[in-house]
């Protein structure tokens, strides 16, 4: 037992053995450092950790009467934390070994089943190269080894062994790699649970902390160093002293259920939980696939001493000196071979296989080797390894769904190296990891490095993409920028046009229409090309049509509809802002409040704007002519007025000629009544599409028109005095505006008489002259058949020119005097001969010139030199308008037929 063995150097032991990181990266995969066999175990330990100060802590073999001494021992060990590794003396190790052997001999009298013996022989045959097989072992220790290798199982269970490799962290940053050979299934005694509970109690973990421990297969905690040979009596003492006797096995079996209720996305700053999390990461990363998922499904029953001795007997690769006894030297070399065999036997699909419950116990035992006050410095290792693909220990980066770790395809040594890389990437700030974030890593590590123990589909469900706050803020800003509407205007446009919504929408529509026109031209060219190809091969073209193949024909476009613009706000004499205060009481207080509320309008507000106050305007929403959303996207406008659901279908719509004729017939059919509203209701019911209010308004306007035209009114004659006051700025007064309006439908059945224009006597004169010219040209001596010849037209031109010459000669002779007209340039009065009258000046301020001053450049404030002058050859007679009988249709008090409606 005192013989040495070869020790495998792993990534977890590099810093402890004095090796640098570069050596770890180059040679650590498949390299082993063998120590001389003649060196004793004590010297081997001291040579591997020469800086450790030996501080012997005697561990007494306790019984039920020595609880106080052991607890003092535990408290003393908690009060001091060594930043360096230390070694144990040989006396300590002898005492520990002796105590372990005595504990194992107590249960030596129990019979050993033949199945266990056969398993033991198989284990020995698997490791023929072991350096310790040649040394004889006493018969009593052989029985102890047989009992300590396996858990007490029934003979019916299959005996295939699974190797579980656990990485242990103690209070001095020590790392141990244990090898536990157990059967597939095995019951565990409740004494084991009591022992683990006792360790938890000694370390200050009571029932309230049981919810924090979320992993069955790895319960990270501890400050005691008796992780492999602690006595059962000591555990009873610990349980009794800390009041944890009520802790049952269900705390561990139900911890998987507790872990399912933990939010894996919320961080916290519990340093204690952080260290537990890191220990759990390291342990579970070292587990093979088939050992991870079965830990919560096995019953926990079995003899305690066998479990403890199996932990002691199957240790492998002890890297640091702790409270481990001399049983470290009893570790077999075949455990290395079994580790490789178990890793190679991992299923390629990553599906979980049953694993013994003893893994949970070993993880519990090894997690109790770390003091609480040392947890803040435990994760500050200076070693950094390159992050592996899908590393679950890197908490600073968000999890990604596509990060499945391909551990199944790696060799055993590569797997171990990868796990060591993951171990070295622990966060240095203990406040970065929350209790709920511990649940993330616990759950993900239970899955065995992202999907080792669970199927990949289940493992992916626990890992989601969590964007950082900056990413979410940038995404939100980008969405807000995308919501901003596109503004269409030219830099050279006027400021009023740049901020005008109708102008911007119009430019946007023009831009879209131009693009659609370009696309239409390209589509026409494509259609012509396809037509020529189809004419070359018509049969193939028809076959493609029958097969419904994609020929590449262009798709039809949805032509953008022209925007509806309310022109009243631009053509009316008053703007929106002035119209708002027209015909209202102009109180200063009210005007000030309105200004404070709405402010000065930066641009004219269109009634077409469907947005409310405070909402952003959208200029990019263009209605499509053939789309159903074109008309329903905003409120309907009918001749400049908003139409809502409360308005009738014919709201603000012009009356058609048919409706007007039917109205005239109904006015005769329904005579006037005392209550006119009844009459209007009857007519509205007869029409069917108009309301009584619309009929009353129409009839009122119709009666006024009839009265002004002098036509008998089929009802009460309205008082025209109320309606005779017209605005001088009416748009209908301008003669050019008569083409902008549709003819009235009021007088559809009445043909008004034709009157001569009384305001212009010259039109009568010119019309008479034109008639005379036409009479003169119609010479009956010339046959009708010759009147279409060009010679006849030339003859008419000569006759017209002759008449003009005669008029000019008469004017130059001085016989014509324009009485009442004075030349505005030379001042001669009356003007003789031809009088030149300005046509561009207003009639009240028009200028007249004589024939000699017609070529002068006379200008005034009103008259300019570019004005057009009209020659007048004949003098006009004076006509006093005050003595003329009015030919209008308005009332006249001199008219004997004057009979007003209201007397």
Curated annotation (Swiss-Prot):
Zinc finger (ZZ-type): 818-877
Pfam families: Myb_DNA-binding, ZZ
Keywords (A to Z) from UniProt: Acetylation, DNA-binding, Isopeptide bond, Metal-binding, Nucleus, Phosphoprotein, Transcription, Transcription regulation, Ubl conjugation, Zinc, Zinc-finger
GO BP terms, alphabetized: chromatin organization; regulation of cell cycle; regulation of cell division; regulation of DNA-templated transcription; regulation of embryonic development; regulation of transcription by RNA polymerase II
One GO MF term: zinc ion binding
SMART domains per record: SANT
Annotated stretches, region: Disordered: 1-149, 297-358, 373-481, 602-636
Gene3D superfamilies recorded: 3.30.60.90, Homeodomain-like
UniProt-annotated binding residues for Zn(2+) 1: 823, 826, 850, 853
Annotated positions of the N6-acetyllysine modification: 394, 701
Annotated binding of Zn(2+) 2, by residue: 838, 841, 863, 867
Site of covalent link Glycyl lysine isopeptide (Lys-Gly) (interchain with G-Cter in SUMO2): 276, 647, 708
Cellular component GO terms, alphabetical: ATAC complex; mitotic spindle; nucleolus; nucleoplasm
Cystine crosslinks: none
Subcellular location(s) per record: Nucleus
Outcome when changing residue 824 to A: Loss of histone H3 binding. Significant reduction in the acetyltransferase activity of the ATAC complex on histone H3 but no effect on the complex integrity
Bias kind Polar residues: ranges: 1-15, 61-79, 297-311, 324-344, 390-450
Record's compositionally biased regions (Basic and acidic residues): 91-109, 135-145, 606-615
Domain HTH myb-type: 647-707
Record note on quaternary structure: Component of the ADA2A-containing complex (ATAC), composed of KAT14, KAT2A, TADA2L, TADA3L, ZZ3, MBIP, WDR5, YEATS2, CCDC101 and DR1. Interacts via (ZZ-type zinc finger) with histone H3 in a methylation-independent manner and acetylation on 'Lys-4' (H3K4ac) moderately enhances the interaction.
Protein name: ZZ-type zinc finger-containing protein 3
Species per Swiss-Prot/TrEMBL record: Homo sapiens (Human)
Gene: ZZZ3
